[in-house]
From Swiss-Prot:
Disulfide linkage: none
Homology family: Belongs to the peptidase U48 family.
Membrane topology: Multi-pass membrane protein
First-listed, main subcellular location of the protein, grouped into a coarse class: endoplasmic reticulum
GO BP terms: CAAX-box protein processing; peptide pheromone maturation
Catalytic residues as annotated in Swiss-Prot or TrEMBL: 126 (proton donor/acceptor), 160 (proton donor/acceptor)
Protein name: Probable CAAX prenyl protease 2
Domain of life: Eukaryota
Coiled-coil annotated spans: none
Chain ranges passing through the membrane: 3-23, 42-62, 174-194, 236-256
Annotated catalysed reactions: Hydrolyzes the peptide bond -P2-(S-farnesyl or geranylgeranyl)C-P1'-P2'-P3'-COOH where P1' and P2' are amino acids with aliphatic sidechains and P3' is any C-terminal residue
Organism: Schizosaccharomyces pombe (strain 972 / ATCC 24843)
Any one GO cellular component localisation term in the record: endoplasmic reticulum membrane
EC primary class: hydrolase
Amino acid sequence: MRVYLISFFFTAIYVVSLYTFPVARPRPSLNRNDPKVITARCISVLLASSVCCILTRLIIGPSLNVFTFPTDQVLKSLLHAATIFIGPLYEVWIVDKEYRLFFIHLKDCLSNAIAWRNIIIGPLSEELTFRCCIVPICEAAGWSRLKIIFVAPLLFGMAHIHHTYEFLLAYPNAYIAAALQTVVQFSYTTVFGWYTTHLFLSTHSLFPSFLVHAFCNSMGLPTLYGKIGNRNQTRIYYTLLLLGVLIFYMTWGITDFNNHQDFEPRLVPLN
């Protein structure tokens, strides 16, 4: 039971921290893309994830160092994640020819608060809290690998439900839209959490899950319907989209790493 309480506590620390600063608190006129709101929330979640890291170390001891960088496993994780985006990558690089503007886009991202939130601070703070803290706590409680992969990410999905409250403040009567948004967001964040939890359990390093998270956020959700360029390009895109899913499944084994560090969690009475 204690493992659930600690995990919920860490989740609460993370979510509540978003509203620490008055400028970032929910209100009908709140614009979450306002640079001041983004800055306040980025500072808050970094502090929250740091607190969770300290508490985790106190609970399970110093036996795990999540800040090592296993280069081979990082590259394989990124390559595996990229397979499911073969279609979107074709759209960006071939159809839209975004490679011509790569350095311009890179410069814009480095000076754009939204990009920093979505691609760097958000993934970093979330992976620290929901993978590097909650997952080792579950391991220390003696949970099986399968249970950790499928249960722990539910908290990651729940942590995004607060967006529903903000949505209803802006659109008070849009209950159906809010419910749909909640279900969709909870579903895809939980499923994504299954994958990054698998990566973390396979490496016990922050970086594979963080960099995969950052990459996926930069790509966004793939286009699932509609025209992509001309007719031939549309056919190629959807063919590659399906092929990417197949390759992702067939190459799953490249992410079944032997842990690059021997982590023996100090079993503590958390159940």
